[in-house]
Amino acid sequence: MGRFLDLRSSMNAGVSGAPGVPITATPALFGVIGLQTENVSNKVITLTGMVGVSSLLLGTTFAIQICRGTTVYNPANVIYTLVQNVRLSAFSDTYAFTAQDLLAPAAAETIYSAFIFGGSLLGLLFTGERVGPEVFWGIASQGAP
């Protein structure tokens, strides 16, 4: 049977309408958590979050990436990537994501950071506005031996 280690959350914007900034080509940090992982191996980390995005342009997409071990964006630390189409609407939609990190090395604390960005990735065009809410959370457990 598995054993619970820690649960942490990070809320960047708790309401619709915030932060109210455009999605840019520069990855923007919207959540950081430091899970207390007690130097155990065989960890199961489940990461979940949601963002509110709005766009009046057809074909709008955005990307979310989760990095392990840093609060500064570094492509070498990316463990999860989501590329999402935005529904054409004058109102915002909320987009949820879930990832697991089954390869995290043993550490007293494991940091995870969530970034949202636009620009160009694989020839896709990213645009839109971050209109909230924005939240990121994670649960750490030790898997069965």
Labelled PLM ranges:
Residues 1-145:
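Extracellular jelly-roll beta-sandwich "head" domains, especially the C-terminal globular C1q domain
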